[in-house]
Amino acid sequence: LKTFCLFLQIAVFIALGIQIFLCGTDALNNENELFSVEYCGANCTQQDNGSWTKCKGNCTCYHEDGKRYGLCLSTEYTDFTQFPKPTSEEIADASPRPKETNSH
């Protein structure tokens, strides 16, 4: 039962992350801006002293009020208007190329 509850919690948090992502991008309503949320593959817990276990890297602990457990998530906002528009040549240079094969 405890494993099922943990699985259910993770599913809810992932759904919440997706909802935040969709609401964030819809609220911006601008293709030049992007807000993304990713699950970092780890959980966090509240210690007896009230502090929370640390998440690694750029991840932050997100939890519901009153709960002693949460998920490590990374969030990122990108405003593409801060970058110049690429030229056709830059786009061509960045495009994937077919893999070259040696014939025998």
UniProtKB/Swiss-Prot annotation:
Location of the region described as Disordered in the Swiss-Prot/TrEMBL record: 85-104
Signal peptide from the UniProt entry: 1-27
Presence of the UniProt keyword Disulfide bond in the record: yes
Keyword Disulfide bond among UniProt keywords: yes
One Gene Ontology CC term in the entry: extracellular region
GO molecular function annotations of the record: C-X-C chemokine binding
Superkingdom field: Eukaryota
Residues carrying a glycan: 43, 49, 58
Compartments it resides in: Secreted
Keywords tagged on the record: Disulfide bond, Glycoprotein, Secreted, Signal
Disulfide bonding pattern of the chain: 40-59, 44-61, 55-72
Function: Salivary chemokine-binding protein which binds to host chemokines CXCL1 and CXCL8.
Protein name (record): Evasin P1174
Species this chain originates from: Ixodes ricinus (Common tick)
